[in-house]
Amino acid sequence: MSSPLTPDICIIGGGSGGVRAARVAAGEAGAKVALAEEDRYGGTCVIRGCVPKKLMVFASAYAPMVDEARAYGWTGMESGDFDWGTFHGKLDEELNRLEGIYRRLLDNSGVQKFDARAVIKDPHTVELSTGETFTAKHILIATGGRPLRPEIANAE
C-alpha cells in the first residue's frame, strides 16, 4: 500500500538523535518529516539505559537512609523488603511519561510518526512493517548502536 506522503526527509529511529533531527528539520527548516520507530521513542538512554539506571540507584539509596535517619532522631521508621514489582510499575510509569514527552514534541513540530519498523528499499523509498511505502527526498538512519558485551566472566 502506498502513501500519498512524500516527505522531504524520512528518519528511521526515534531515539534522541532521530527525534532531534526530526524536530529541527520540521520545526526550524519547515521540511515535511516522517519518522519511523519500531519500539519506543526516547532511545537507549531514556528507555533502557541512563534513566532506568538512575531510578534504580535512587530507589536503592533508601534502605541505608532509614538507619541513618534513626541516628538523627527519626522514630517510627522501619527497614523493609524491596518490592521489585512495585518498583517496576513506577519505572514503567516514568518511562511512559518520558516517551509521551517525545511524542508530543514530535506532534507539536508537525512530524508524521510511524510506529513501525522501516526498511530502505532504494535510495528514496522506505517500506514500513505495516506494508506501507513512501518516497522521500532524503533518508536519515538514526538507529543508534548496539552494546558490546565483552566475553569475560560475569559480563551479563
Q: What do the predicted segments below correspond to?
A:
Residues 3-17:
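Beta1/beta-strand and adjacent pyrophosphate-binding region of the FAD-binding site
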